[in-house]
């Protein structure tokens, strides 16, 4: 969130950024904490959940259901949502991969939210941008994610200003 803060400030966008993410969170854990996020009265939420569910091979229907509830509740609060999608590696098998990969575009279409198709674009499977676990981004990877995410956040801020 610090990188996003700096980028927003550099572009004269002075919204406050609150990082409510917890490393390792699943969609169920995100759903359990949703009321805490809503209590902060955010104008915009960047929703980046689902990757940890995938790593635990959680049924895509459950992931969809959890994210669906989260997006629905955020929408009911008139919060602008930026949904960051994830993609399953082919090692998970074609059925799981297809089911998982379709969750995010389906939700984006259903709720008409700002949609970033793949949060890890440009860094997934590239060791130089990943921590030793080959999953999470390192500092350089985080920079790339922040740069990739920025246009979507800018779109969210513009939508907020047009409210």
Q: For the regions a protein language model found, what residue spans apply to each?
A:
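Alpha-helical cap/lid subdomain in secreted, periplasmic
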Residues: 3-6, 10-13, 29-163
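A short beta-strand-loop structural module common to alpha/beta enzyme folds
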Residues: 11-26
């Amino acid at each position: 969130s610090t990188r996003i803060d700096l980028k927003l400030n550099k572009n004269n966008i002075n919204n406050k950024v609150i990082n409510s993410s917890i490393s390792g969170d699943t969609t169920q854990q995100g759903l359990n904490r949703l009321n805490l996020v809503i209590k902060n009265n955010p104008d915009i939420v960047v929703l980046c959940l689902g990757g940890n569910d995938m790593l635990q091979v959680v049924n895509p229907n459950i992931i969809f259901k959890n994210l669906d509830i989260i997006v629905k509740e955020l929408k009911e609060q008139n919060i602008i949502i930026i949904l960051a999608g994830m993609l399953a590696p082919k090692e998970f098998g074609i059925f799981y991969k297809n089911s998982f990969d379709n969750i995010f575009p389906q939700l984006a279409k259903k709720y008409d939210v700002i949609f970033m198709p793949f949060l890890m674009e440009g860094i997934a499977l590239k060791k130089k941008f990943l921590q030793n676990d080959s999953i999470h981004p390192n500092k350089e990877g985080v920079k790339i994610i922040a740069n990739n995410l920025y246009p979507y956040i800018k779109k969210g801020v513009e939508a907020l200003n047009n409210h």
